[in-house]
Amino acid sequence: MSTLLIGDVHGCYHELRDLLSLADFDPARDTLWLTGDLVARGPDSLAVLRYVKSLGDSARLVLGNHDLHLLAIYAGISRNKPKDKLTPLLEAPDADSLINWLRRQPVLQVDNDLCLVMAHAGISPQWDLTTAQRCAREVEAMLASDSYPFFLNAMYGDMPNNWSESLSGLARLRFTTNALTRMRYCFPGGELDMICKDAPEDAPAPLRPWFDLDSPVREAGYSIAFGHWASLEGRSTPPQVYALDTGCCWGGTLTALRWEDRHSFSVPSRRASRHAKAE
């Protein structure tokens, strides 16, 4: 039995199946963890969602910012843009079923036996694991409720950027959503910077990648796996932190990490060239 962690798929269905074949993934035996952003930019988001949904309990995923944006489009809150290549999914006969399944997926995965945490963008350095789990459950409950369009309409925005237990309502939910699905850089005190998308070597002072700040989660012995940040190309992270987005939808690769022995697998994108961007 293996635990296979895979970075952002972004609609790259054929690469996903290539990678699972390379890693000898068997859903009857193994468990697949996905860092989110299953959809958008790649050519076949519909096939990706159908396949991952079909895996049932053999797949554990977290929602990414593009997955949340898909929910907002389907709810009529955001506009469907051609560059996202989502029209076949939005017009599919099983779209309702797929969307309702997707909005009931978590934004945080924790396995205490593996000492492993997964979130699309990472874990705020201002949080311990208990706080992260509590905040994630609040967002998940809202997404699963009949009020989810109200939340999706209010989730866009960069503030507040500083965690406090006194945060409440939509402000609290927005901070959690940004920390788990959009974060890249923080100020030295752990406050979120939602502007910079540069590679770490080009980021202006005093910004630092979130994983370069002290982390109560890592200090408690947990490792953190995340996606979202393709320009890292899986590198530049400290021990216990695993960056898995290697830019498949931009012409890079799709990467998997087998947790038990930390062996990595990758397959090339079927797209002709790499145009790495931060999204």
From Swiss-Prot:
According to the UniProt record, what class of enzyme is this?
hydrolase
Task: Identify its protein family.
Answer: Belongs to the Ap4A hydrolase family.
Give the InterPro entries listed for this entry.
Answer: ApaH, Calcineurin-like_PHP_ApaH, Metallo-depent_PP-like
Record field: catalytic activity = P(1),P(4)-bis(5'-adenosyl) tetraphosphate + H2O = 2 ADP + 2 H(+)
State the source organism's domain of life: Bacteria
What the entry lists under NCBIfam families is as follows: apaH, PRK00166.1
**Coiled-coil residue windows:** none
The UniProt record lists the keyword Hydrolase:
yes
Q: What is its EC number?
A: 3.6.1.41
List the top taxonomic levels of the source.
Answer: Bacteria, Pseudomonadati, Pseudomonadota, Gammaproteobacteria, Enterobacterales
- In Swiss-Prot or TrEMBL terms, this protein is called Bis(5'-nucleosyl)-tetraphosphatase, symmetrical
HAMAP family in the record, alphabetically? Answer: ApaH
Instruction: List UniProt keywords, sorted A-Z.
Output: Hydrolase
Write one Gene Ontology MF term: bis(5'-nucleosyl)-tetraphosphatase (symmetrical) activity
What is its biological role? Hydrolyzes diadenosine 5',5'''-P1,P4-tetraphosphate to yield ADP.
